[in-house]
């Protein structure tokens, strides 16, 4: 942990690389903020975004910039007359990430599909448990891969999310793929191809069947998602807990030189 004096010094007298990255940090934060306006789940990528920046000031600037679009979007609701000021709490509850705020539709993926026999379940208990597991896995990944390359941290967070999420959106299967392609692990492509094949069966083949028949086929398909879990776990960057020295950016090298 930084002493208060050192913390203030890095803010007021940043390294050249940190100062040069400030402009890009603003744009990166604003883009992340726009993503949060569309969906609240990108918040799990914010730690990796901050790790990609070279210094304390650029990270703080990016974090503040990330909060600007959601705040402006939220304030536009009562200002534009679409929502009363007194109803903002209800809006926050509807879009929040607290376990009690998440829609409790489960049974499409993983462990909740096994619990429900592949049927949709409106019981909020599995959804709450899953949310707590996701948050715990996020903290665990940030600790276990704290010295890893930021992309590897992102891979770990997103794959852990896939293991513990109580519900499934088709877009979830796409989140980790660009990062695994950019920095593939040994089991990256088996995990990618397995998820693609599983999704193709569910979204391209099963949807050709009429209602009742689709519903009966959906059950074994949802439960079969558990077969992908060994591939997802194997695809985690287990051997890359520490970033390679040769791959370190000049900015990070400069920070390390100053510390020494």
Describe the predicted segments one by one.
Residues 1, 11-15, 41, 165-172, ...:
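Residue-level signal for functionally critical sites in structured catalytic/ligand-binding pockets
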Residues 1-19, 25, 50-157, 201-260:
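Primarily membrane-embedded glycan-assembly and transfer machineries that use lipid-linked glycans
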Residues 21, 25-54:
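Voltage-sensor/pore transmembrane module of 6-TM cation channels
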Residues 38, 45-47, 136-187:
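Membrane-water interface signatures at transmembrane helix termini and the short loops
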Residues 43, 59-60, 188:
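Secondary-structure boundary/capping residues
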Residues 176, 181-204:
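C-terminal hydrophobic structural anchor segments
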């Amino acid at each position: 942990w930084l002493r208060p004096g050192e913390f203030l010094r890095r803010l007021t007298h940043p390294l050249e690389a940190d100062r040069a990255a400030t402009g890009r940090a603003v744009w990166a934060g604003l883009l992340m903020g726009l993503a949060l306006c569309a969906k609240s789940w990108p918040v799990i990528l914010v730690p990796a975004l901050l790790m990609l920046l070279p210094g304390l000031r650029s990270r703080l600037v990016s974090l503040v910039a990330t909060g600007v679009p959601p705040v402006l979007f939220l304030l536009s609701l009562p200002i534009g007359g679409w929502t009363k000021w007194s109803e903002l709490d209800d809006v926050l509850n509807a879009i929040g990430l607290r376990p009690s705020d998440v829609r409790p539709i489960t049974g499409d993926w993983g462990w909740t599909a096994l619990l429900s026999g592949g049927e949709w379940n409106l019981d909020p208990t599995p959804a709450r448990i899953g949310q707590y597991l996701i948050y715990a896995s996020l903290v665990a990944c940030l600790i276990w891969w704290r010295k890893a390359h930021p992309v590897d941290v992102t891979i770990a967070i997103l794959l852990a999310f896939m293991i513990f999420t109580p519900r499934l959106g088709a877009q979830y299967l796409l989140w980790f793929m660009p990062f695994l392609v950019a920095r593939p692990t040994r089991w990256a492509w088996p995990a990618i191809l397995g998820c693609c094949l599983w999704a193709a069966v569910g979204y391209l083949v099963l949807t050709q069947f009429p209602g009742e028949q689709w519903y009966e086929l959906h059950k074994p398909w949802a439960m079969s998602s558990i077969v992908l879990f060994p591939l997802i776990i194997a695809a985690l960057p287990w051997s890359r807990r520490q970033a390679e020295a040769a791959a370190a950016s000049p900015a990070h090298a400069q920070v390390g030189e100053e510390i020494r």
